């Protein structure tokens, strides 16, 4: 259950920091696995949520409310998709995307990627790759197949007029922060268009974090469906499924999706991101780790994967001892998903801390 041999009990957060029950402060480079995009207790966000709690929390999906209108207005400043479905998590956003693709095309086949991660509900889990997540829940949803990530020839062979959709992460997070190649993303777009299939881009982890609102913008292609979650609500559970086509009303739904509190959380989060230009600034906060034990540093902006030659348990532990919380993506990749409010200077401190730990532990046992 824990990354750490000694599991922390976190009791409060402020900005980029969290504190444990012993009063120790840590730089939080996990941010709830990429969720606390504005950091902890951002004053403007907290005040807006407090006001909403005192006003209206739930209304039901059959009603409109001003918080939804406010959210849509803010969202329209970043993207121009025509339709939006709101759920309560990233995996729900993916479930909706898969259902919409089958509804719209009338086809059943979904093509996903080797080493993909899209969530743990049954449809999203069927698109996810790792057997360890899936084996105890089989049989899963039929109609899914996986092709090697970044393999154009495999995509050409797999995508056909039987395909409803291809689903892909612009950067595979869970498998080690591996960016898609430009030629691969372009091929997916061209191949799906050629056969009338849809392209679903899963931005649950990459969204907001890479220097652009959507990481797919780096590839200069336009997907048919985009899924978002994690940081879009800054801690309030939200999932968004964005499309340029409509589906028949009543074919999918959510009791809590689109509630006033969630809509307000998204609206405030987007407004702060826009006013403080945090998404744009993220592209200049990427750090490169220079150490013999490191093979490479991957990712974009504030989605960073540091690939080690050996397993990284001892480095994760020692960084915690020195006041830095980091995540992992496999046994040899250290993953950083800090709040976007972190400064460039602090990211340089993080770089020095990681390099210092590597240097001090050089030659020790994992």
From Swiss-Prot:
Q: What is its main location?
A: cytoplasm
- Its gene is lysJ
Q: What is known about what this protein does?
A: Involved in both the arginine and lysine biosynthetic pathways.
Question: Which NCBIfam families does the entry link to?
Answer: argD (TIGR00707), PRK04013.1 (NF003087)
Q: Where does substrate bind?
A: 120, 254
Concerning Pfam families, the annotation shows:
Aminotran_3
Subcellular localization(s) per the UniProt record = Cytoplasm
Family stated for the protein in its record: Belongs to the class-III pyridoxal-phosphate-dependent aminotransferase family. LysJ subfamily.
Which PANTHER family has this protein been placed in?
ACETYLORNITHINE AMINOTRANSFERASE, MITOCHONDRIAL, AMINOTRANSFERASE CLASS III
Gene Ontology molecular function: any one: transaminase activity
HAMAP family listed in its UniProt record: LysJ_aminotrans_3
Identification of the protein by name: Putative [LysW]-aminoadipate semialdehyde/glutamate semialdehyde transaminase
């Amino acid at each position: 259950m824990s990354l750490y041999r000694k599991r922390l009990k976190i009791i409060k957060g402020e900005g980029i920091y969290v504190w444990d029950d012993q009063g120790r402060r840590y730089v939080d480079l996990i941010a709830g696995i990429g969720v606390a995009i504005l950091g902890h207790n951002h004053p403007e966000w907290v005040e807006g949520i407090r006001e909403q709690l005192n006003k209206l929390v739930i209304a039901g999906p059959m009603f409109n409310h001003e918080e939804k209108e406010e959210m849509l207005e803010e969202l329209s400043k970043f993207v121009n998709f025509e339709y939006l479905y709101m759920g309560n998590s990233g995996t729900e956003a993916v479930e909706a995307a898969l259902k919409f693709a089958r509804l719209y095309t009338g086809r059943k086949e979904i093509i996903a990627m080797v080493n993909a991660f899209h969530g743990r509900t049954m449809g999203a889990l069927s698109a996810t790759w790792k057997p360890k997540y899936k084996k105890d829940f089989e049989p899963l949803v039929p109609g899914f197949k996986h092709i090697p990530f970044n393999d154009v020839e495999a995509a050409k062979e797999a995508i056909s007029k039987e395909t409803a959709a291809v689903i892909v992460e612009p950067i595979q997070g869970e498998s080690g922060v591996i960016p898609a190649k430009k030629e691969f993303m372009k091929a997916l777009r061209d191949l799906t268009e050629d056969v009338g299939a849809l392209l679903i881009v899963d931005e649950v982890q990459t969204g907001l974090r890479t220097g652009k609102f959507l990481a797919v913008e780096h590839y200069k292609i336009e997907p048919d469906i985009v899924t978002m979650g994690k940081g879009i609500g800054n801690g309030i559970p939200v999932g968004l499924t964005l499309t340029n086509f409509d589906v028949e009303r009543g074919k999918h739904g959510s009791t809590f999706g689109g509630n006033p509190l969630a809509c307000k959380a998204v609206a405030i989060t987007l407004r702060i991101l826009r006013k403080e230009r945090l998404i744009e600034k993220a592209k200049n906060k990427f750090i490169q780790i220079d150490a013999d034990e490191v093979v490479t540093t991957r990712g974009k902006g504030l989605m960073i994967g540091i690939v080690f030659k050996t397993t990284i348990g001892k480095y994760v532990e020692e960084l915690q001892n020195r006041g830095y919380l980091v995540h992992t993506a496999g046994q040899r990749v250290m993953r950083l998903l800090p709040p976007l409010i972190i400064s460039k200077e602090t990211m340089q401190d993080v770089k020095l801390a990681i390099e210092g730990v590597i240097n001090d532990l050089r030659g020790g046992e994992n």
